C-alpha cells in the first residue's frame, strides 16, 4: 500500500470493488450462457461449469425456508460489510496481509449481498466433484474470495501470534 496518507485505505476498498465487479461479470456470463443445472465439463470427472441458484447460505443452509432467510442473510452481510470497512480503516500501514484478507472477504460478501437483495438468490456456477459420485456444493467467485480471505485472515492471526511471542521473549 502506498505510504501517502492522501489515499488512505482506498486501495483495499478498490480491491473489494474489483472483486465485486469480477463476481458480478462472471455470474452474468454464466446466467447468459447456461440453463439451470446445465453442466459444461471442464476437467472430466472433477470440475464443471453449471448454473444454480441458492436462496440459502453456504451449503444451501436454510434454502428451503419460507423466504425470510433472504433478508436475514442480507442483514448479516450488511453488518459484516460495515464491520470490515471500519476494520480496514483502522489498520496500520504494515498490516498488508490482513488488509488483503479483509478486502477479499468484503468484496465477496458484497457480491453475494447484491445477488441476494436484487435477485432473491445467489448465483453459483462452479461445480467440483469426484467422478460424478461426490459433489461439493456449487459456488461462485464471491465464495472463493471469502474463503481465500478467511484463510489469509487465519494465517495473519498465526503470524501475529508468533510475532507477539517472539517480542515477549
Curated annotation (Swiss-Prot):
Matches recorded under Pfam families: Peptidase_A8
Active-site residue numbers: 124, 143
Topology in the lipid bilayer: Multi-pass membrane protein
Single annotated GO MF: aspartic-type endopeptidase activity
Gene Ontology biological-process entries: proteolysis
Summary of the function given for this chain in its UniProt record: This protein specifically catalyzes the removal of signal peptides from prolipoproteins.
Name by which UniProt lists this protein: Lipoprotein signal peptidase
Source organism (scientific name): Ectopseudomonas mendocina (strain ymp) (Pseudomonas mendocina)
Gene designation: lspA
